[in-house]
Amino acid sequence: STGKPLAYLGLDLASTDDMTALAICTGDAENGWGIRMHYFLPEMAIKRRLAKDESSIYSDLKDLKNVTVTPGNVTDYNTIRRLISGHYVVDGKVEYDKDNLSEKYRIKGVAYDRWNSLNLIRDLEGDGVTCDPYGQGFASMSFPSKEYAKAIWTNKLHHGGDPVLRWMMGNVVLRTDPSGNIKPDKGKSGDKIDGVV
């Protein structure tokens, strides 16, 4: 319905055994952006990370409301679908959960990286969610990266103090091409930046 706030979603799907980030963006450039994040990762990813570094932010993830930890070694993409569209599969049967983003927002679209997303995106589109592929090269990432930085500098980006997003922002290293275009560099960044991407 039109009474729902408009939202833009961004989905950075990790490899199945790592952190996936879903950004829920509301607002506009003039008045400011509200960003709510939701993260998904498998339980074994947390255990592996804590085995290397007990003091890492991973020690607090299970206690955060905006983190879904799925059992086992791989992220269950069914949980991502359930949060976005409400649809999910149990024992081969599609179920519906009313507590989902499509019920709360008019979702303009889900921008996603084409890598490793085919089945989930096909399912979301089948659920009636518009999904738009989004490249992670300089041509696609430079303008939004500059706008993101501008929103931060002008205090028009509000994330409610999300500790995971704050940590990821601190990890970002930008790469610049000869034309002055910029983009986050996952390879050179100190740690996870999925929520920023």
Regions found by a protein language model. Name each.
Residues 1-136, 142, 146, 159-197:
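RNase H-like, metal-dependent nuclease domains and their acidic two-metal-ion catalytic environment used
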Residues 145-154:
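Short, surface-exposed amphipathic charged segments that create phosphate/polyanion-binding patches used
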